Amino acid sequence: HATPVTHMRVQGDQDGEVHFDAAAQGVPALAWIVDVPALETRLQDAVRFQPQVELVQAPVPAALTVVCEGRASRTRSELGAEFDIAPYPQHAIATRMACEKPHGQVARQWFSPDGSILAFLPLSGEGGSTVAVVWSVAPPLAAELLALEADAFAQRMQAASQGALGTLTLASERATWPLQQAQARHWCGTLPTSPAAAWVLAGDAAHNVHPLTGQGLNLGLGDAQALAQVLGGRDAWRSVSDLRLLRRYERQRKTALAPMGLATDGLHQLFSRPQGPWQTLRNWGMKGFDHSGPLKDWMARQAMGTR
């Protein structure tokens, strides 16, 4: 259920291209694509064998409540945590496509002249010919694409992907949501109903980025790791609800998130500019970056989380 990404190809809206290669980085894979149902099943199995973890179906009193319900978190709103949102003029369409040609463990991305961004992520399966798709497009185009019959939708996607994987067939339902960059002003606080207890945000409940870099889940996992380290390293006498601990976690994660947020937003802004000088500049920049050596290696390590 986990598919290695051994190559990554990013194509601009003219002739700019960037290639990443796992072998060049000395690693077996640049990333791993995991099916959500498989990941959820494994997590459920793991929880069953953790005697200190109990699954509950209703709120229970606790010294610390970790709020990780997603970007539309109701609990975050009830706690009064302000969430600064900068909407993008795009909606994401997510689905799966069966491809005539095998994906070859290559992740592909296309930037179009109209600002649309199409990403193919390789999935496991017979023949290696299924990809997960995220297509970021303007809201009117999203509505148009979602209204198409399956065959017509596949033809539009085949054209947008320049026929890289041959004939495409829709292999799942289509989902859509509006895109935004967002971050909570404060990630932790005291529970209004219990001054001795605290809350803390993690994952999409704390921050959102554009999916063009494919880092959303990784950033959330980074939150979980950082929070576990801060709490696990506390003095024995200190409660997990100590706001000094939780603010340390908040500072660490905000610092870690800043470069990725700036890079993601910067790329989106650059490729959403009108054609003309901007189109020439960004494609020239892609070609220069592809031959930049140390800079390209540094960016690859950042994306892989190896730094």
Regions inferred by a protein language model and the residue ranges of each:
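FAD/FMN-dependent oxidoreductases across multiple families
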Residues: 141-231, 236-241
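Short, flexible helix/strand-to-coil boundary loops that buttress conserved ligand/catalytic motifs
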Residues: 79, 213, 271
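Short, solvent-exposed loop/helix junctions and linker helices
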Residues: 33-37, 147, 221, 275
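Conserved N-terminal helical subregion
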Residues: 2-78, 84-91
